[in-house]
């Protein structure tokens, strides 16, 4: 290899290093934003949990159709993964596929993220709904739509 080739190769490696460093910075910022959102919702969740627990303690038993076990053995799973690769996505797929109660024949998957959707579809799971487009910018309305779909499916007796 000539000196020119070596210099070109060195420049290429340095350029790749700069790109990698920039990508790490971007992912760090995204992680921090996600962490802030999650931590910001924790007080709300804690208060809701306290409120519901208090109501249940004071009221005794509550008979509501959504609190009773369904008449079917059909199940629903919300699989939250990313649209890009990574070990987390594989672990979610393995967790669901490895659960004996969540067989592909009896389980509908509501996929949030392409990697979970694709991985579970390959394992034979029915993808009831695909919400992969919401993973980058999740909004309240997306959660409300998914909740309505799940409650309607439960109400029809398709999952229990």
Residue ranges and their predicted role:
Residues 1-160:
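Conserved loop-to-helix interface motifs that mediate assembly, gating, or partner/ligand docking
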């Amino acid at each position: 290899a000539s000196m020119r080739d070596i210099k070109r190769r060195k420049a290429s490696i340095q350029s790749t290093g700069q790109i990698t460093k920039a990508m790490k910075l971007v992912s760090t910022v995204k992680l921090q934003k996600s962490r802030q959102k999650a931590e910001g919702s924790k007080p709300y969740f804690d208060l809701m949990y306290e409120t519901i627990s208090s109501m249940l303690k004071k009221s005794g038993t509550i008979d509501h159709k959504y609190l009773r076990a369904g008449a079917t053995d059909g199940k629903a799973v919300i699989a939250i993964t990313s649209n890009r690769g990574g070990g987390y996505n594989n672990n979610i797929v393995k967790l669901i596929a490895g659960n004996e109660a969540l067989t592909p024949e009896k389980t509908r998957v509501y996929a949030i993220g392409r990697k979970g959707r694709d991985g579970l579809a390959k394992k034979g799971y029915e993808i009831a709904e695909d919400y992969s487009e919401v993973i980058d910018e999740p909004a309240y309305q997306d959660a409300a739509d998914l909740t309505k779909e799940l409650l309607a499916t439960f109400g029809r007796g398709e999952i229990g």
